[in-house]
Amino acid sequence: MQLKTSIGLITCRMNTQNNQIETILVQKRYSLAFSEFIHCHYSINANQGHLIKMFNNMTINERLLVKTLDFDRMWYHIWIETPVYELYHKKYQKFRKNWLLPDNGKKLISLINQAKGSGTLLWEIPKGKPKEDESDLTCAIREFEEETGITREYYQILPEFKKSMSYFDGKTEYKHIYFLAMLCKSLEEPNMNLSLQYENRIAEISKISWQNMEAVRFISKRQSLNLEPIIGPAFNFIKNYLRYKH
């Protein structure tokens, strides 16, 4: 069994207009299903129902992109200008072997045509994979800055809070570890312009936004990743922290 670990930072603020706790969430620019397909994280020998389910979980635009059979365009949709030539060559050869050589993509297009509905782009807590010899907290801080543009001096880490969640997809165990931070007063205003921080963020992020608990619940119902079991306890911790702080 393979284990993949990601580490993130739940960063909160008190919205001074509505007196609600909010946290920063980022939205991926592509669906998890699309990423899994492009990186060949599936079995070509799996039953058709499993493959169709993967296409079901893509957005309509992603399915249309796959139907072009243009792997360069699919790859660019995820990586943009990031130079990962060795990985690209490896994944292209697998795509070519799986779908182009047998029948010039006819089976792939047929499977996509059987897909129904539309997947959603994932909202999640800023997180990422640790580098070699990097501590969990250092990783969380680095990933948060890379994805939001907010640097370390603008928030306070609350070291008493650390929470993790895991899930297993039949082949790989995914473990997410989260730390908690509170934004400094200077950035608590509701009109804080996150778009300025976002403009030069990494390619995988499409949006960044403050979300309260009601919004977190709404988002969780519309996607496969349920954020409430992580963000709910974090908000409760913040409430107690603010109560005793004052």
Swiss-Prot record:
Which residues make up the binding site for Mg(2+)? E134, E147, D169
Q: What induces it?
A: Expressed early and up to late in the infection cycle.
- Known catalysed reaction(s)? diphospho-myo-inositol polyphosphate + H2O = myo-inositol polyphosphate + phosphate
What compartments host this protein? Host rough endoplasmic reticulum
Listed A to Z, the keywords are: Early protein, Eukaryotic host gene expression shutoff by virus, Host endoplasmic reticulum, Host gene expression shutoff by virus, Host-virus interaction, Hydrolase, Late protein, Magnesium, Manganese, Metal-binding, Multifunctional enzyme, RNA-binding
Q: Where is this motif: Nudix box?
A: 128-149
Which residues lie in coiled coils? none
Please name the Pfam families in this protein's record: NUDIX
Enzyme Commission identifier(s): 3.1.3.-, 3.6.1.52
Q: Which cofactor does it need?
A: Mg(2+); Mn(2+)
Question: Could you tell me the Gene Ontology terms of the biological process aspect for this record?
Answer: AMP biosynthetic process; ATP biosynthetic process; symbiont-mediated suppression of host gene expression
**Superkingdom of the source?**
Viruses
One annotated GO molecular function is: metal ion binding
Subunit (UniProt): Interacts with host RPL23A.
Q: Which family does it belong to?
A: Belongs to the Nudix hydrolase family. DIPP subfamily.
- The name of this protein is mRNA-decapping protein g5R
Q: Which organism is it from?
A: African swine fever virus (isolate Warthog/Namibia/Wart80/1980)
